[in-house]
Swiss-Prot record:
SUPFAM superfamilies: S-adenosylmethionine synthetase. This is S-adenosylmethionine synthase. ATP binds at H15, D164, A165, K166, R230, F231, D239, R245, K246, A262, K266. GO terms for cellular component: cytoplasm. Signal peptide: none annotated. Its cofactor is Mg(2+); K(+). The gene is metK.
Amino acid sequence: MPHQLFTSESVSEGHPDKIADQISDAVLDAILIQDPKARVACETYVKTGMVIVGGEITTSAWVDIEEITRCTLAEIGYVHSDMGFDAHSCAVLSAIGKQSPDINQGVDRIDPLDQGAGDQGMMFGYATNETDVLMPAPITYSHRLVKRQSEMRKIGQLPWLRPDAKSQITFKYDKGYAVAIDTIVFSTQHEEDVTQKQLEEAVMEEIIKPVIPTQWLSSSTKYFINPTGRFVIGGPMGDCGLTGRKIIVDTYGGMARHGGGAFSGKDPSKVDRSAAYAARYVAKNIVAAGLADRCEIQISYAIGVANPTSIMLETFGTEKITIQKIMSLIHQHFDLRPYGLIKMLDLLKPIYRATAAYGHFGRDVFPWEATDKAELLREQAGLNQ
């Protein structure tokens, strides 16, 4: 097979869609602190000078949505009208309703283990051994670039940076393995008086070089840094932002399939979120155990029904034991019923705001990134002999 090129992108916490995701998840976290059993589906819209927070929330908690919104915007860095958005002066509108009782009766049960899925749908999880975090290289390094931009901005190393930024990396693959970087694209919002030459040099020296391993780079690697030559108007002034519009950035950068459901603003009774996390947990432990080099899992559910309607496993010919044996180990060691996976991954804690920028996967601070079952899986697969 000839060389193939594969591209993934990421966006910073100051991107309009990511602002919306972070506000939705900040509201969710604030509610879970008081009421872990709350039902939350929180959507956010941001545009110049305005934030609208809406959705369906059923809870005994009271949270100050306006204060949460302003604090989130300030933490991201939108604190002055010069940036086109100011946390302190923007309008914040709330339009919150309650979850339908028709859904409640399908989800809530006397025995928690019988808790039904909050909706139908299919979710995917994926892992690959091509990076240290068992994630695809293109999305991993795309995330790290925009995360580095945020760090340089917040510590004042590059004080002319502004919150909105995007990255995109094209990797060259040979026989399914990443071998080199073909192209790096990086665009960052900046103050008006910064020259293109000054910006290009700073981005290369302070953002790209510290993040990208030299073994991926060569004299033929192409760089496009702020290729339009100007990125002063950005954030919500440049584009409106909506919760749930960056689902490929949130997951595997297009390297794996996606069921279509967004994550942010949803409590873990919504399998769009919790089952996608569980699928990643299963796939990562399979790869960490050495049962396969690459692994993709699909799980599907019916609303109000506890047990998955299907589980699919794809290892792309990299499996070290039979697919049937791996499937047997999944059924034996992973409870993929809605309550089972919530308990397995301890998902009722207020951990979601941190997921809403720089990827839900590939960062070890999250419980679904643990590889605590890998040794057991390896032993029962007979690979320790």
